[in-house]
Amino acid sequence: MRIGLGYDVHKLVENRPLIIGGVTIPHDKGLLGHSDADVLVHAIMDALLGAAALGDIGKHFPDSDKNFKNISSLLLLSKVKDLINKEGYKIVNIDCTIIAQKPKMLYHIDAMKKNICKCLKLDNNMLNIKATTEEGLGFTGKEEGISANAICLLN
């Protein structure tokens, strides 16, 4: 059994789509990043790579590589799944938290879960996604960015 922990954060900016868990969420700002800046999927990828001792997403998908410009993070997640499977690991479960003051994530979590489970070929009960605010505190509370944490168990 191997445990991995992932964390990601991106700044909210104008003129970018807000994509979290592969879901485009209506909002006046989106997340800035080289790829689609999907903080949830990035945190999950780092957790999976960490548990398998395979480094992090920056090692495998550097922001200096034009091939990853605006790429869907779900495509990268599929590649991470292949990497960990190649090493002989299988996902037991993943638990995640999205930290955002706005917009409310509650209405989008089911679609996020569906996207990620499909990508990783997981049963619905193997992935949990939660969302919280920081009650107006810090950069997420001031709506300057969104962050996500993920923890996974591999066998």
UniProtKB/Swiss-Prot annotation:
Enzyme's top EC category? lyase
Q: Which Pfam families match?
A: YgbB
Superkingdom of the source?
A: Bacteria
Q: Which GO terms describe its biological process?
A: isopentenyl diphosphate biosynthetic process, methylerythritol 4-phosphate pathway; terpenoid biosynthetic process
Q: Which residues form a coiled coil?
A: none
Task: Tell me if Nucleotide-binding is a UniProt keyword of this record.
Answer: no
Which protein, by its recorded name, is this?
A: 2-C-methyl-D-erythritol 2,4-cyclodiphosphate synthase
Organism of provenance:
Clostridium botulinum (strain 657 / Type Ba4)
One molecular function GO term is: metal ion binding
Functional note: Involved in the biosynthesis of isopentenyl diphosphate (IPP) and dimethylallyl diphosphate (DMAPP), two major building blocks of isoprenoid compounds. Catalyzes the conversion of 4-diphosphocytidyl-2-C-methyl-D-erythritol 2-phosphate (CDP-ME2P) to 2-C-methyl-D-erythritol 2,4-cyclodiphosphate (ME-CPP) with a corresponding release of cytidine 5-monophosphate (CMP).
The gene behind this protein is: ispF
Task: Say yes or no: keyword DNA-binding present.
Answer: no
The pathway this protein participates in, as annotated, is: Isoprenoid biosynthesis; isopentenyl diphosphate biosynthesis via DXP pathway; isopentenyl diphosphate from 1-deoxy-D-xylulose 5-phosphate: step 4/6
Q: Which InterPro entries match?
A: MECDP_synthase, MECDP_synthase_CS, MECDP_synthase_sf
Q: Which reaction does it catalyse?
A: 4-CDP-2-C-methyl-D-erythritol 2-phosphate = 2-C-methyl-D-erythritol 2,4-cyclic diphosphate + CMP
Which CDD domains does the protein's record reference?
A: MECDP_synthase (cd00554)
What EC number(s) would the UniProt record show?
A: 4.6.1.12
Q: How does it assemble?
A: Homotrimer.
